[in-house]
From Swiss-Prot:
InterPro entries: AAA+_ATPase, DNA_recomb/repair_RecA, DNA_recomb/repair_RecA_CS, P-loop_NTPase, RecA-like_C, RecA-like_N, RecA_ATP-bd, RecA_C_sf. Its main location: cytoplasm. It comes from the Bacteria. ATP binds at residues 67-74. This is Protein RecA. It is found in: Cytoplasm. Belongs to the RecA family. The gene is recA. GO terms for cellular component: cytosol. It comes from Chromohalobacter salexigens (strain ATCC BAA-138 / DSM 3043 / CIP 106854 / NCIMB 13768 / 1H11). Can catalyze the hydrolysis of ATP in the presence of single-stranded DNA, the ATP-dependent uptake of single-stranded DNA by duplex DNA, and the ATP-dependent hybridization of homologous single-stranded DNAs. It interacts with LexA causing its activation and leading to its autocatalytic cleavage.
Amino acid sequence: MAQDDNRSKALNAALSQIERQFGKGAVMRLGDTPRVATPAISTGSLGLDIALGVGGLPMGRVVEIFGPESSGKTTMTLSVIAQGQKQGKTCAFIDAEHALDPTYAEKLGVNLDDLLVSQPDTGEQALEICDMLVRSGGVDVIVVDSVAALTPRAEIEGEMGDSHVGLQARLMSQALRKVTGNIKNANCMVMFVNQIRMKIGVMFGNPETTTGGNALKFYSSVRLDIRRTGSVKQGDEAIGNETRVKVVKNKVAPPFRQAEFQILYGKGIYHAGEVVDIGVQQGLVDKAGAWYSYQGNKIGQGKANAAQFLEDNPAIMEEIENEIRARLLSTPKPEAESQEKAAAAQDDDSLV
């Protein structure tokens, strides 16, 4: 017992010295902080929010979205920005590809007047702007589109055909080392859009890899693999893409879940269609033949008409969506838990 007391005193002395040297809160017991559910921003896709396990993409983390060309990567990031702006959050878009279409962004629900946009000349400039925005503490969501377009200054100033081996990977590695701590402190989500490249000479396994080295894979809390699986057709005309998103890495919930949804051209993620599909799966929306009904009332013949009814009646759609989220998102109630523990501790004290 005496030895335990000495160890405890030594630990307390060390903690006091650390707090004096580095400030209060430099070291603390994990149980001292209140447990809160991970704050998240919806992706705009109900199925993907459920697959992510926390109702969306987590705040204060790095997120990577990658996939082939025209798979919906930028559409996904603009959808997240639109959802964030609805919650009153400040969003920024670092357009390294110089390909942002304001008209399309507006159609997806983005408020252009409030969106901060930067079109940097070099990769260093883009990441420096990102770091300064994070450190300001006034930005909630930052999108970098894309990692492949973050061209190092040496490459831009050099001759065409010059070899710059590993330059972009070193740039990303250094930037992420610098910015990660600030991202957590500012509770800001930074989303990196990435492209796919092929590894040469791979005989077995997946030859696909993402650009910018391995650092982003390690620092990301969530990695989403987005793919186009087919076309949505109205008669002979293609009006959208069938899209599948796989959560290949998730530090805030179980990974490897999948979500499938439609992205309609000029409209974005087909949210009402997802609510109908998942509502049928959960037994909230009844389907008899081609007719869909909710609480005994017919809402439309065919999925398109049922979805249109929900779009015209947002209160009913919100009611169905809230019920789906309550059933499928097993979010703990940390406040209730902490209150129960406090009450139990008081009971124990009174018994003593």
